[in-house]
């Protein structure tokens, strides 16, 4: 199999260190992976750049759910993007949609300008646009480096047909990065089915967080009531298995 670029979705400084140990050369740096990945702290970015050799794509996403942002959220994203670029991020990951689900080119252009020569990655907002191939053409025209997609399906394996069409449509003008539900069992299949030369995945495990055990009736999250006595972290063995499966 051809040389495959490995990008791991990291939710912390520790995740990034483990991703490098597993064999990744690039990460998408986030916080709150449970929510699909939100903007990381500046401190996290600075530590990752200081103590690893990873290419770091910094997520710019201030909240969960969709991608039609208020003016307050948009201003926050602009400031976060500037801080990330000024502090060594190798690229920005973001996406803006209008109310109708089409790409908001004007807002995208603002962050593209901030990123300058660094990578500009349009995230999985592409997976909810009404016409993904038309949207891909627009991303190419805007100057995006790469687009992350599951092929408008819950997993990249299920969306392999559309991902393959996107690779063909791109013709090398933009990189197509499959992500979503990639595991050691399907990673190589996705590569073969789509013709991509890179993959994006998270490989997590739960780790005990003992400090809350005195009162297990307390929850700090929302209605989903996530467990407070454990946290999701990157699993070195889990990441390594995916990479070795290629």
Curated annotation (Swiss-Prot):
Keywords, ordered alphabetically: Cytoplasm
List GO terms (cellular component aspect): cytoplasm
Tell me the domain of life.
Bacteria
Q: State where the protein is found.
A: Cytoplasm
Keyword Cytoplasm attributed: yes
GO molecular function annotations of the record: copper ion binding
Give the HAMAP family listed for this entry.
CutC (MF_00795)
Q: Which family does it belong to?
A: Belongs to the CutC family.
What is the protein's name according to its record? Answer: PF03932 family protein CutC
Organism lineage reads as: Bacteria, Pseudomonadati, Spirochaetota, Spirochaetia, Spirochaetales
